[in-house]
Amino acid sequence: MELLPLWLCLGFHFLTVGWRNRSGTATAASQGVCKLVGGAADCRGQSLASVPSSLPPHARMLTLDANPLKTLWNHSLQPYPLLESLSLHSCHLERISRGAFQEQGHLRSLVLGDNCLSENYEETAAALHALPGLRRLDLSGNALTEDMAALMLQNLSSLRSVSLAGNTIMRLDDSVFEGLERLRELDLQRNYIFEIEGGAFDGLAELRHLNLAFNNLPCIVDFGLTRLRVLNVSYNVLEWFLATGGEAAFELETLDLSHNQLLFFPLLPQYSKLRTLLLRDNNMGFYRDLYNTSSPREMVAQFLLVDGNVTNITTVSLWEEFSSSDLADLRFLDMSQNQFQYLPDGFLRKMPSLSHLNLHQNCLMTLHIREHEPPGALTELDLSHNQLSELHLAPGLASCLGSLRLFNLSSNQLLGVPPGLFANARNITTLDMSHNQISLCPLPAASDRVGPPSCVDFRNMASLRSLSLEGCGLGALPDCPFQGTSLTYLDLSSNWGVLNGSLAPLQDVAPMLQVLSLRNMGLHSSFMALDFSGFGNLRDLDLSGNCLTTFPRFGGSLALETLDLRRNSLTALPQKAVSEQLSRGLRTIYLSQNPYDCCGVDGWGALQHGQTVADWAMVTCNLSSKIIRVTELPGGVPRDCKWERLDLGLLYLVLILPSCLTLLVACTVIVLTFKKPLLQVIKSRCHWSSVY
């Protein structure tokens, strides 16, 4: 009897534990498809046909993306009245019942992208009207027209962000966004919009970001969204962009007009805060210097704007598009892939704050460097892929490129640069002059030479760390061509014979170089001075496309990480040299497109097992006049290689001895045939009687 209370307590404890375990197992079974973190439930991609009902009722974020729900019923979300964020992206939704959001008074973010809501858009619109506190709504990819979108957005005055991207909207008027006074972000990209009526966005007083990319807009005229900060109209068919005239102050900071068909530089607001202007891939050019126009009528264009019963005429100067634009705060200007043949006087002077200028792939022939042109704040200048044959530097101009850090002049027609141009560029770190037919100035360089520039001098550019001279047709390098620089990256590729069989011209920068490219330079193994032992910090070496027959020499403490030996004349690799580099940290080596002998690759096991050869599947070798992939070679030494590994002396003896014996027998027969007396003597002396 004394033990009865103890047994009762133990029994009650085990029953409680068992009940808890069973209930926990049931809960885990119902929640196993979802990940629960705090108040967030992630059920994406679980092939759910309905909203799970056993999740914690206090959940505030529910993600059901990529589940075949098809229909959101009135009761689907009732267990979760505290939801603040709901994502139903790619759920094949065709219908949302009218009362689906009736109990979701706390919902702030709703994602319905990539569904089929155009099927029952009226019922969906009625369901959305029950969300008075909704701030973010994503309706992208639902095949909605402008009328459907207008109905769904009706009475949702609390919205801050709306996405209608990827729908079938064609025209916009003031009825589509009526009542959205608090809207700040509007995404309309990837529609079919070809017309925007005047006043379509007038009711959006708080709008700050507008995305109209990937549509069919032919022009934007009388642009007057003064409070807009970011406008993206890229990938349309724009031929004109004209802002509203007058003295209205615009808050526009970023304007993207890239990938259009603009013919003229856009007419920007007279007062703005523009910081980023993207004009890439258009048909723009400046034309004043190309056409001798003396008549004022030939220098203007008039736009007739008809809005109902009101007709406005806008007169624009064709040749001075930028003169009235406010570019004082501009930081980033991308004018690449256009038709600019020159830059007008004073164009860059209007941008004193400009730090990045991209003029890649235009038709520039000359560039005049004057005071404040380019501006002193410029840090990156890209003039690559033009037709530049000469750079003009104003006399007596000092520190014109004092802030420049990156200067790209590749793929032009330059023969040299003005004396002193780089001497004033005290902060330049990256310089690309590849694919220009330049030559390097001898030592000492004439700093006071006159006439057109005929060479380039890189000496004493203390800040220079990266230099590319690929394909410049350079002759043999002069003495100390890079003296006084801090080069860590040097590309001399495709300059045949530039080293003249020696690495001595690189001795000034050899201890600092980390990346060296000597591709397609005609290097061959007979260069006795081709020794990289002095390049103590070298990590990446490209020797592809040369005529090397032996492995380069790497002495000292050189620890390469990447080595490229493709397209050479290597027949084998010395195992000692390769093993040394592997032990020092060689991570990647390229060996393909060399005439290797298959009988000399059996020692490459360390390379193969270490996965060091990046192009191992492409490495081939020669076996009995057949090209075979190394990966397809049989295990062990191939049969055709065994004869090659025999002692050559023994092989020659085996081949010569039968020939000698045959020759001796033939000589004996001939002598005995033509010497009959001798034969008789031999017979008489060797005769003996037969015994029967």
From Swiss-Prot:
Topology of the protein relative to the lipid bilayer: Single-pass type I membrane protein
UniProt-recorded Gene Ontology molecular function terms: receptor ligand inhibitor activity; transforming growth factor beta binding
Leader sequence segment: 1-18
Record-level GO cellular component terms: cell surface; endoplasmic reticulum; endoplasmic reticulum membrane; extracellular space; plasma membrane
GO biological process: immune response; inflammatory response; microglia development; sequestering of TGFbeta in extracellular matrix; transforming growth factor beta receptor signaling pathway
Annotated tissue distribution: Mainly expressed in cells of hematopoietic origin. Highly expressed in bone marrow, thymus, liver, lung, intestine and spleen. In the brain, highly expressed in microglia.
Transmembrane domains' residue ranges: 651-671
Cytoplasmic-side positions: 672-692
Topological domain ranges for the Extracellular compartment: 19-650
Keyword Disulfide bond found: yes
Record SMART domains: LRR_TYP
Keyword Mitochondrion carried by entry: no
LRRNT domain sequence ranges: 29-56
Subcellular location: Cell membrane; Endoplasmic reticulum membrane
Keyword annotations of the record: Cell membrane, Disease variant, Disulfide bond, Endoplasmic reticulum, Epilepsy, Glycoprotein, Growth factor binding, Leucine-rich repeat, Membrane, Neurodegeneration, Repeat, Signal, Transmembrane, Transmembrane helix
Family per record: Belongs to the LRRC32/LRRC33 family.
Record disease entry: Seizures, early-onset, with neurodegeneration and brain calcification: An autosomal recessive neurodegenerative disorder clinically characterized by refractory seizures apparent in the first year of life, mild early developmental delay, and developmental regression after seizure onset. Other features include hypotonia, hyperreflexia, peripheral spasticity, poor eye contact, absent speech, poor head control, and inability to walk. Brain imaging shows reduced white matter volume with delayed myelination, and punctate calcifications.
PANTHER family xref list: SLIT RELATED LEUCINE-RICH REPEAT NEURONAL PROTEIN, TIR DOMAIN-CONTAINING PROTEIN
Complexes and interactors: Interacts with TGFB1; associates via disulfide bonds with the Latency-associated peptide chain (LAP) regulatory chain of TGFB1, leading to regulate activation of TGF-beta-1. Interacts (via LRR repeats) with TLR2, TLR3, TLR4, TLR9 and probably other Toll-like receptors. Interacts with CYBB/NOX2; the interaction is direct.
Descriptive protein name: Transforming growth factor beta activator LRRC33
Gene that this polypeptide is encoded by: NRROS
